[in-house]
Amino acid sequence: MPVLHNRISNDELKAKMLAESEPRTTISFYKYFTIASPQQTRDALYQVFTALDVFGRVYLAHEGINAQISVPQSKVETFRQQLYTFDPALDGLRLNIALEDDGKSFWVLRMKVRDRIVADGIDDPTFDASNVGDYLKAADVNAMLDDPDAVFIDMRNHYEYEVGHFENALEIPADTFREQLPKAVEMLREHADKKIVMYCTGGIRCEKASAWMKHNGFNKVWHIEGGIIEYARRAREQGLPVRFIGKNFVFDERMGERISDEVIAHCHQCGAPCDSHTNCKNDGCHLLFIQCPKCASKFNGCCSEQCCEELALPEEEQRRRRAGRENGNKIFNKSRGRLNSKLSIPDPAE
């Protein structure tokens, strides 16, 4: 019987990936469609992906699939063909290719079955997730940005918006997608007569959000096809002005893709212009925050003097201090302090 999960340590896997000579391509994709048996589908896809040396993070649920992966460049076309023939619903599926890619985005394949491919918190049996808003392509996005009757809504989390967003886009201040949905409805009541344009990283969140807005009585709703990644790629290919400002946060080891030269965020320690996220080097903290090179040197990669001091302690003492401590990494929010999260790099499904 084939092994359908990883048995090698993260350190060993990462070292193996870093030693690879063949370049890799980072790809993301999603599809809302009915999967009758998510576990069986997961196990079958796991065998397909491992045979092609695919790394990454894949979620499956009855409502569909959500994936961020890394594929050896020589196997990208084979991967595409096998994905398209795996299920008729996946035939011709758009694959978002990373805008900036060092090939080191993932080093292990993790595939999980979940209740939802995006945790939306929706518990309304009358909600029709297929009744989505209209798609906007790159040229349409730019036209909408110049339309005074249009309102752009960023359906990403606060730490994503902080480092990059579309011109004049509204932020829905929240730490997770499930918190954003009811807030978006509330905040946009005063714009009910406007054209609502929703966007996110790759399209999966804004697609469901557009259906939620329509469910709540908003009639003029659009969302950007393929999200920021597809927009920036197509705008560049077509010689259009790229109207996204700053960096696009991504949920892998890269933590960001440069879209424009502007740096709109600031170091969380000294306030200098900076948009590079990192995790606190103290294993008992792992706070996700923005740190400039000067502060990284000053604090040895830590978020505070306290963590810097703890990192300098003998490993045994560090482990003792971590024991019993709330185990969960955190995300820095300037308005609310430290927020709990389960991953060093936040979970894209949240």
From Swiss-Prot:
Transmembrane segments: none annotated. Keywords: Oxidoreductase, tRNA processing. This is tRNA uridine(34) hydroxylase. Belongs to the TrhO family. It catalyses: uridine(34) in tRNA + AH2 + O2 = 5-hydroxyuridine(34) in tRNA + A + H2O. It comes from Salmonella gallinarum (strain 287/91 / NCTC 13346). Gene3D superfamilies: 3.30.70.100, Rhodanese-like domain. The active site is at 200 (cysteine persulfide intermediate). GO terms for molecular function: oxidoreductase activity, acting on paired donors, with incorporation or reduction of molecular oxygen. Its EC number is 1.14.-.-. PROSITE patterns: RHODANESE_3. Residues 319-350 are annotated as: Disordered. It comes from the Bacteria. Catalyzes oxygen-dependent 5-hydroxyuridine (ho5U) modification at position 34 in tRNAs. GO terms for biological process: tRNA modification. Residues 146-240 form the Rhodanese domain. Residues 319-328 have a biased composition (Basic and acidic residues).
